[in-house]
Structure formats: C-alpha cells, structure tokens
Amino acid sequence: MALTKERTASVVQQYGSGEKDTGSSSVQIALLTERIRQLTDHCKVHPKDKSSNRGLLVLVGRRRRLLRYSRRVSMGAYRSLVKSLGLRK
C-alpha cells in the first residue's frame, strides 16, 4: 500500500526544491495525495475494508490541515499546487 521509493523520489523531485526536500509542505501534500489516490482505488475494490477506509479519512484530514497552512502562508504557491495536483478547491 505504501508508495514505492521510485514514485516517492519522483514526487519529491517534482514538487520539492531539491532531491532531499521531503519536509516542505508542498512535497508533503503531493505525497499524501498520491497515497490517498492509491487508498481510494483500494477502497473501491474492497468496500468492506473499514480500517483502510478510516486510514483514508485520516490522510485526507492531514492533507486538509497542510493545505490550510499552505494557503495561509502563500496563496500563490497554494493555488499552483492545487492546480498541478488536480484538487478541488
């Protein structure tokens, strides 16, 4: 269920300022979005897997908090991130 190292590295490279930049909010939001997409597909295939459904809700809440922080700090960066990830906001 976790992201592969290659996929994580590509997301960090795409949204981060450097290869080792895993702590910035934009990278964290992008990584959470990838995990959410994977879990969403899993929950569609296995609708009775309640623990995965709860984990999905936890990840969505974490991403929501990070998006709120990103919007508060820099509106321009927030808008470009939401547009590049294809999120509804």
Swiss-Prot record:
Keyword terms: Ribonucleoprotein, Ribosomal protein, RNA-binding, rRNA-binding
GO BP field: translation
Record-linked InterPro entries: Ribosomal_uS15, Ribosomal_uS15_bac-type, uS15_NS1_RNA-bd_sf
Domain of life: Bacteria
GO cellular component, one term: cytosolic small ribosomal subunit
Keyword rRNA-binding belongs to the record: yes
GO molecular function, one term: structural constituent of ribosome
Region span, Disordered: 1-23
A Pfam entry, by short name: Ribosomal_S15
Family: Belongs to the universal ribosomal protein uS15 family.
Oligomeric and partner information: Part of the 30S ribosomal subunit. Forms a bridge to the 50S subunit in the 70S ribosome, contacting the 23S rRNA.
Function per UniProt: One of the primary rRNA binding proteins, it binds directly to 16S rRNA where it helps nucleate assembly of the platform of the 30S subunit by binding and bridging several RNA helices of the 16S rRNA. Forms an intersubunit bridge (bridge B4) with the 23S rRNA of the 50S subunit in the ribosome.
Protein name (Swiss-Prot/TrEMBL): Small ribosomal subunit protein uS15
